[in-house]
């Protein structure tokens, strides 16, 4: 197979600071190139998912954005992250869809719940090694 992995996803946003805050403060992701972005040297920032994968956070006037055609993406959580994350996000008032429930994915069955980022993109948060 020629495809061996995923490099990045791009999230268009009208509120860059709100999206940076969401991915950094809510999902505890490292934000890359923030100083360069704020200095106008680069056109977007990125949130580190793993050593191999990033989410680019691109400022876009909504009328300039391509028609949205993404339903969701799924982030895999570490084995202990699920213990408190659901309740922490709920307490912060993050828009959620339902409770933690079993779901099938690339690594088989796991437990997941869904949240939305500030631009309305659905994010599944899944753990394969956690059991309630």
What do these predicted ranges mean?
Residues 39, 64-66, 104-107:
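Short glycine/serine/proline-enriched coil/turn segments at secondary-structure junctions
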Residues 12-54:
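Core segments of cupin and vicinal oxygen chelate
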Residues 55-58, 124:
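Conserved beta-strand in the GNAT
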């Amino acid at each position: 197979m020629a495809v061996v992995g995923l490099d990045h996803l791009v999230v268009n946003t009208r509120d860059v600071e709100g999206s940076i805050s969401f991915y950094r403060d809510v999902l505890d992701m490292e934000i890359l190139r923030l100083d360069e972005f704020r200095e106008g040297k680069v056109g977007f920032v990125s949130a580190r998912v793993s050593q191999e994968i990033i989410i680019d956070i691109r400022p876009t006037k909504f009328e300039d954005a391509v028609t949205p055609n993404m339903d969701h993406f799924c982030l895999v959580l570490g084995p202990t992250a699920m213990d408190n994350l659901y309740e922490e996000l709920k307490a912060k008032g993050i828009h959620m869809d339902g409770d933690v429930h079993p779901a099938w994915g690339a690594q088989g069955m796991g437990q997941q719940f869904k949240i939305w980022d500030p631009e309305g993109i659905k994010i599944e948060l899944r753990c394969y090694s956690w059991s309630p």
